[in-house]
Amino acid sequence: MTSATASTSPADRTTAPKPFSLRDATPADVPAIHAIYAHHVLHGRASFEEVPPTLDDMQRRFAEVQCKGLPYLVAEREGEVLGYAYASSYRTRSAYRFAIEDSIYIDHRRVGEGLGQALLAELIARCETGPWRQMVAVIACTAGGEGAGSLAVHERLGFRTVGRLEAAGFKHGQWIDTVLMQRVLGAGANTLPE
C-alpha cells in the first residue's frame, strides 16, 4: 500500500491535506469502481461508452485484467474508493503483447486532489516490473478543454503525444478528438524481449 497526500489549492491551505492510500483493487471494490465509471459514462466524455456497463460486466472486466497479471489499483481514504487505475492490453493481436494501455477514472467529486497522478505513477511503477515495454494513453479531448488535465498528468509522468484522431467520437452533442500518448516502460525498444 502506498500513501499519498491530496494536493490543495491556495484557498484550502488552512486545512491539513487529506491523506489517501493506493492499493491493489479487490473484487469487493468493483461496486465502487462501477459507480465511478457509470457516472463518467453518463455525464462525461472520457469514456466513449454511452450506456454504463452492468455490475456483472464490470466484474468480468476486472477479472480479465487480473487474469492477465496486469495491475488494477484503487485510491482510498477511510475505506472509500476515490478513484481507480488499471492497465490492459493495448490491442488483442499477439504482436502487441508488450504494449499496454492505461485507464484512470476518479470520483467526479474528488477531481483535483492529486489522485490521478498518484494512481498513474504507481501504475507505471508496477508495469515497469513486468514484461511490457510501452504504455499507451488514449485520451478524449474536446474544444472546450475536457481532457486537458489528463494530458498534463500524462506529460508530467513522461508520456509524449504521438498522434491525434480528430472528431473520432461524438457524445453529449459534441465531437471528441482522441489524443494518443506513449511512454517507454523499462528498456523499451533498446533490447529484445526475453
Briefly describe each language-model feature range:
Residues 24, 52-109, 120-121, 126, ...:
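Acetyl-CoA-dependent GNAT
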Residues 112-127, 148-156:
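Conserved acetyl-CoA-binding loop-helix of GNAT-fold acetyltransferases
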Residues 21-33:
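A short beta-loop-alpha structural element at the N-terminal edge
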Residues 127-142, 146:
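Conserved GNAT acetyl-CoA-binding A-motif
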Residues 1-17, 155, 183-185:
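Acyl-donor-binding surface of acyltransferase catalytic domains
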Residues 86, 138-140, 151, 155-177, ...:
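Conserved catalytic-core motifs of GNAT/GCN5-like acyltransferases
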Residues 34-61:
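Conserved GNAT-fold acetyl-CoA-binding loop/helix
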Residues 103-112, 139-143:
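A short, internal acetyl-CoA/4′-phosphopantetheine-binding micro-motif in the GNAT/acyltransferase core
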